[in-house]
């Protein structure tokens, strides 16, 4: 019994499906959002400190 190109079609379909699943983010969404929020808060804190230092006339940051 011959399957024709069904095997090749299935391989291509499975490859496409596996690539799509790799793009999907793994893990608990709540924990991921909290971690991302903490990173953004740290970045914002650093930016605020840099702006305050520039306003005071000091230049600790990049020129």
Curated annotation (Swiss-Prot):
Keywords: Cytoplasm, Nucleus
Start and end residues of each stretch annotated as Disordered: 1-63
Major localization class: cytoplasm
Protein name: SERF-like protein C1705.02
KW Magnesium (keyword) present: no
Gene Ontology, cellular component aspect: cytosol; nucleolus; nucleus
Amino acid composition bias (Basic and acidic residues), ranges on this chain: 1-13, 25-35
Compartment annotation: Cytoplasm; Nucleus, Nucleolus
Biological source species: Schizosaccharomyces pombe (strain 972 / ATCC 24843)
One Pfam family cited in the UniProt record for this chain: SERF-like_N
Family matches, as InterPro entries: SERF-like_N
